[in-house]
């Protein structure tokens, strides 16, 4: 996506510099390319930030895979899947919005941005429901991990899975593997939920930042600031929003679909 022509200067604008064209740029094309380069550099720093979290996730899961299988039982895959669909829809409408800005479809741009903003609100609403449920059950980060009676019952049940029909008898079965003491298991689960809240919480903050940026672009679209030669802010916000969606596409299976 690029801007290939300069908008002619109208009588009410400064000579040689149309509205929204910064004075240190010679054309909308140059301004767009410079802005997009800066946006990509910013997105690389965001990727590096989340890469550190994904590395921490990989190390801890490699060392304690059983804790992730137990912890995943307390996550609602249906809510996570719904949020995934919502963000995928928002990426589609954001891409349509960028296209509408490129071809001077102001009404389409406004509608697409509004739908994208609505999808972001739905995502945060579902995430609030999830967090509220975890808070009620005491399934919080390390140091605050104090499971409620129902959660503790589920945790105890995970220690004694139902035997399969073809299992050997008690006389011939090998000795069971040693299980960590309850306090140690709770501590490990607390670390699991620390990872969960850190990764999903940081992602939620990025969603809120994206919603703020979309609101800013939406207000400017209503004020007729964008046209086929000047749509850079819409494109930049769209890139950011797509990255936020992509990060969630990785978070969802890694946290919710472990089993």
Residue ranges and their predicted role:
Residues 1-259:
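...captures the hydrophobic TM-helix bundle architecture rather than a specific catalytic motif
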